[in-house]
Design a protein with these regions (language model features):
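Membrane-embedded transmembrane alpha-helical bundles that form the catalytic cores
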Residues: 1-471
Length: 472
């Protein structure tokens, strides 16, 4: 079930909120758990056992870690069981066929692909990391063991963040999970509705609209009747315009989903962590990764980078740790060599900044932002090079070897205003405008009402538009 659909907006969400608010305090987590299962199983019921297995593995290992509090060996074995079980399922469903096909390509073997796993269980990359963060934190004694399986299940499958984040650690919500009375206040619900509306507007008014520019250039894989330019016919300037449009679409799509999730979490009484902080205003790649998908970066930093030694064991070890994290980041995004190359691409950039570039970037004012945006857009070109209808080699030849073809003037006329608005919405200027409007209760309410009404009109009139990060 997608947030930006009629069935979610006008049926599931209001019914779920009504049941949740009307439920007795002690039953709120049960209602949340059951409604979240309905949300997940709506389109992915065949993968429900996978999620249930992950919940049970980490729940039981958590209990075992408490049971063997003084037995270091037993605790380590239980942690390894949780890691092997959780990561093993993620590997099987997401990476097994990729590994087999890669072995076939490299060694000329004839391993047949595993049948039945061509479709990835929805959200598995996200909820696997959430369950693992709980077990690791219990092992490290950073959080107490959760004894109530319904409460633990509600944490794992909580529908606002289940499918595409933000990645919520157990300690982020554990206190609120055990507050049964006065979990939320009217102000929280109001703030949550505001955040949800902004997220919905980001998705349907900006992401989907600007994504149409990229579609006009590259085409739609499942709609051959739709007219488009085609990558082979596009000029170099038009291809750059298309990749910039894709970069904007990806940001508004993912940050919009995250904002909707954070808003719904607030309506339920939970404070989810921020996931984006205007990444396109960054003045370095290092800063970009502090602002983009912050919960994923934070997860890798806490559970991989720091345990490997972090910044404590000299520059060479820092570079190695960075290599591991960026490689895993690329692998996490998808079972494809494009994503692995994308992760290694960012490793090289981050390593160069750590070695010598960062001091120079901090001294600059304009050029560091141009440098960062250029490299980020090139990175997204590697990202989209995996999509249907995009030939990776042709895309990069078009980007870096000047070629003729259809020019961008027509598209600039059609999308110029939208591009300008999108660029402004990538900066803190939009937040300053909102603070100005929200000083007055009437203008605040009218702004939200207009955004919600227009967004709903677009939802009603549009076809299905899934979130891009559902693929990961």
């Amino acid at each position: 079930m997608v947030f930006s659909t009629i069935i979610f907006l006008l049926r599931f969400l209001p019914i779920t909120l009504a049941l949740y608010y009307l439920a007795p305090p002690k039953l709120k987590n049960t209602v949340l758990f059951l409604c979240s299962l309905v949300f997940y199983c709506w389109g992915e019921v065949r993968f429900f056992p996978v999620m249930l297995a992950l919940i049970l593995i980490n729940y039981l290992c958590g209990l075992g870690l408490e049971r063997f509090e003084q037995n270091k060996t037993a605790r380590l074995i239980l942690l390894l069981i949780a890691l092997a079980g959780s990561l093993g399922m993620l590997f099987y469903f997401k990476y097994a066929n990729f590994v087999l096909s890669s072995i076939n390509a490299i060694f000329g073997t004839g391993f047949a692909p595993i049948q039945g796993i061509s479709v990835l269980p929805l959200g598995i990359s996200f909820y696997t990391f959430q369950t693992l963060s709980y077990t690791i934190d219990v092992y490290r004694r950073d959080v107490e063991t959760e004894h109530n399986i319904i409460d633990f299940g509600a944490y794992v499958v909580m529908f606002p963040q289940l499918i595409a984040g933000p990645i919520v650690k157990y300690r982020d919500v554990s206190d609120r999970l055990h507050v049964y009375k006065s979990r939320y206040k009217l102000k929280q619900i109001e703030d949550g509705m505001t955040l949800f509306t902004f997220g919905l507007a980001k998705k349907v008014l900006l992401a989907d609209a600007i994504g149409a520019l990229w579609t006009d250039i590259i085409g739609v894989a499942d709609s051959p009747s739709v007219s488009f330019v085609g990558l082979a016919n596009a000029s170099t300037p038009l291809v750059w315009l298309g990749v910039i449009a894709y970069s904007l679409q990806l940001y508004f799509d993912f940050s919009g989903y995250s904002l909707m999730g954070i808003g719904m979490g607030r309506m339920l009484g939970f404070d989810f962590p921020q996931n984006f902080n205007y990444p396109y205003i960054s003045g370095s790649i290092t800063e970009f990764w502090r602002r983009w998908h912050m919960t994923l970066s934070g997860w890798f930093r806490e559970y991989v980078y720091i345990p490997l030694g972090g910044n404590r064991k000299g520059l060479k070890r820092q570079i190695f740790n960075l290599f591991v994290v960026e490689l895993l980041t690329g692998i996490w995004h998808g079972a494809n060599w494009n994503f692995i190359c994308w992760g290694l691409y960012y490793f090289v950039l981050l390593a160069l900044e750590k070695l010598f570039l960062l001091p120079y970037l901090k001294k600059g004012r304009v050029w560091p932002h141009i440098y960062t945006l250029f490299l980020v857009v090139v990175g997204w070109a590697m990202f989209v090079g995996n999509d249907a209808g995009v030939e990776f080699g042709l895309l990069f030849r078009k980007l870096f070897i000047p070629s003729g073809g259809v020019m961008p003037l027509y598209f600039l006329r059609n999308y110029g205003v939208l591009l300008a608005v999108s660029v402004v919405c990538c900066t803190p200027l939009i937040e300053k405008l909102w603070k100005l409007l929200s000083r007055n209760a009437i203008t605040k309410a009218l702004t939200i009402l207009v955004l919600l009404t227009v967004s709903m009109a677009y939802v009603v009139g549009s076809t299905n538009s899934p979130f891009l990060y559902f693929n990961f």
